[in-house]
């Protein structure tokens, strides 16, 4: 007897455009990525440079990987300190632990700037 399809398998099957009983077409499931934001940063730094779809895929994987590492480290820090909420302090400490030297300093300063901008706009 074949194994039952998981919930993930059912979602993948829903991606195809089929006509349900009520006659309306189904939409494709959206795939979230950082492509738009990576492209915007590229154009700020090098306006005359393009990027291939394979390079964009690699960059997207890289951003997802770094995000997951920072989130996991911040979660660990919150757990160590018996906190149930991850604050900007845990994120900042996680960035300092994960990123090397000068890169961590720049990331922390940019993050602080972004948080300040967000709180002042509220």
UniProtKB/Swiss-Prot annotation:
Residue positions the entry lists as glycosylated: 109
Changes after translation: Monoubiquitination of Lys-117 gives a specific tag for epigenetic transcriptional activation and is also prerequisite for histone H3 'Lys-4' and 'Lys-79' methylation. GlcNAcylation at Ser-109 promotes monoubiquitination of Lys-117. It fluctuates in response to extracellular glucose, and associates with transcribed genes.
Region called Disordered, residue ranges = 1-30
Crosslinked positions (Glycyl lysine isopeptide (Lys-Gly) (interchain with G-Cter in ubiquitin)):
117
Which CDD domains does this UniProt record tie to the protein? Answer: HFD_H2B
GO BP terms: innate immune response
PROSITE patterns noted in UniProt: HISTONE_H2B
What SMART domains does the entry give?
Answer: H2B
| Any one GO molecular-function label of the UniProt entry | protein-containing complex binding
Q: Which GO terms describe its cellular component?
A: chromatin; nucleosome; nucleus
- Coiled-coil annotation reads none
Q: What is the top-level taxon of the source organism?
A: Eukaryota
Mind telling me which Pfam families this protein's record contains?
Histone
- What subcellular locations does the record give? Nucleus; Chromosome
Please give the chief subcellular localization of this protein. nucleus
Q: In its keyword annotation, does this UniProt entry include DNA-binding?
A: yes
| The entry's keywords | Chromosome, DNA-binding, Glycoprotein, Isopeptide bond, Nucleosome core, Nucleus, Ubl conjugation
Q: What does this protein do?
A: Core component of nucleosome. Nucleosomes wrap and compact DNA into chromatin, limiting DNA accessibility to the cellular machineries which require DNA as a template. Histones thereby play a central role in transcription regulation, DNA repair, DNA replication and chromosomal stability. DNA accessibility is regulated via a complex set of post-translational modifications of histones, also called histone code, and nucleosome remodeling.
Q: Which family does it belong to?
A: Belongs to the histone H2B family.
Q: How does it assemble?
A: The nucleosome is a histone octamer containing two molecules each of H2A, H2B, H3 and H4 assembled in one H3-H4 heterotetramer and two H2A-H2B heterodimers. The octamer wraps approximately 147 bp of DNA.
**Protein name in UniProt:** Histone H2B 1
Taxonomic placement: Eukaryota, Metazoa, Ecdysozoa, Nematoda, Chromadorea
């Amino acid at each position: 007897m074949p194994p039952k399809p998981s919930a993930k398998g059912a979602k993948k099957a829903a991606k195809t455009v089929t006509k349900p009983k009520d006659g309306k077409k189904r939409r494709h499931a959206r795939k979230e990525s950082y492509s738009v934001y990576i492209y915007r940063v590229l154009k700020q730094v090098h306006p005359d440079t393009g990027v291939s779809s394979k390079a964009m895929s690699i960059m997207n994987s890289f951003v997802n990987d770094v995000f997951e590492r920072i989130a996991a480290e911040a979660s660990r820090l919150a757990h160590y300190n018996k906190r149930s909420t991850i604050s900007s302090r845990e994120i900042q400490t996680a960035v300092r632990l994960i990123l090397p030297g000068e890169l961590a300093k720049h990331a922390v300063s940019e993050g602080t700037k972004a948080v300040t901008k967000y709180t002042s706009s509220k």
